[in-house]
Regions:
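Ser/Thr/Gly/Pro-rich low-complexity, disordered linker/stalk segments of secreted
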Residues: 16-26, 158-159
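Extracytoplasmic/secreted envelope proteins and their assembly/folding machinery
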Residues: 33-41, 59, 63-66, 92, ...
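C-terminal edge beta-strand
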Residues: 4-15
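A short alpha-helix/helix-coil micro-patch that ends at or immediately precedes a cysteine
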Residues: 21-71
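Disulfide-stabilized extracellular recognition modules
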Residues: 101-159
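Surface-exposed patches in mature extracellular/periplasmic domains of secreted proteins
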Residues: 46-60, 73-85, 120-137
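Short, surface-exposed glycine/acidic/tryptophan-bearing loops
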Residues: 60-105
Length: 159
């Protein structure tokens, strides 16, 4: 196996002015996570790339990282979280953070932010990746969304 190194860009944007951040229940968060999976797979289909399969370990790792409320890439934290979740390979990751966006629009905003950022877009449509995990955390400071896409041919140095 070989390792891969990538540089990704974090996109932080403000949402609608004056909108409040609704209290997000676990079911709303789970629904938004699944909607991100659906939207990422839609982007992949539009670009001629096979859909990703949900991976429980990557879902757990992404949710853990989102729950840490880290709004920028920390490779060691991400690699350790993915390894601890049980995913044995390398991965790509996207993060986006925003405020003042209703819970019902979280998934759409996250994927749109990634679509509009060249590095994030390339992570979403990487043909080497075959699995996906998503995490979302919302508090009074805003929402953070994590995306992990698993690459079975890449190496995680912490795994």
């Amino acid at each position: 196996q070989h390792g891969q190194t990538a540089t990704l860009t974090l996109t932080v944007v403000d949402g609608k002015q004056g909108a409040s951040i609704p209290e997000s229940s676990m079911s709303q968060t789970d629904a938004a996570r699944q909607e991100i999976v659906r939207l990422v797979n839609q982007v992949r289909r539009e670009n001629g790339v096979p859909e990703l399969t949900v991976n429980a370990a990557l879902m757990d790792a992404a949710q853990h990282c989102a729950s840490l409320r880290v709004a920028y890439h920390q490779n060691k934290v991400e690699c350790e979280a993915v390894a601890a979740s049980g995913y044995p390979h390398g991965f790509g990751s996207n993060i986006t953070a925003f405020a003042n966006v209703p819970a019902s629009e979280t998934a759409g905003r996250a994927v749109e932010n990634w679509r509009n950022s060249p590095g994030h877009f390339q992570t979403m449509i990487n043909p080497d990746c075959d699995t996906i995990g998503v995490g979302i955390s919302t508090d009074e400071g805003g929402t953070i969304c994590f995306l992990f896409v698993g690459d079975p041919n890449a190496h995680n140095p912490y795994a």
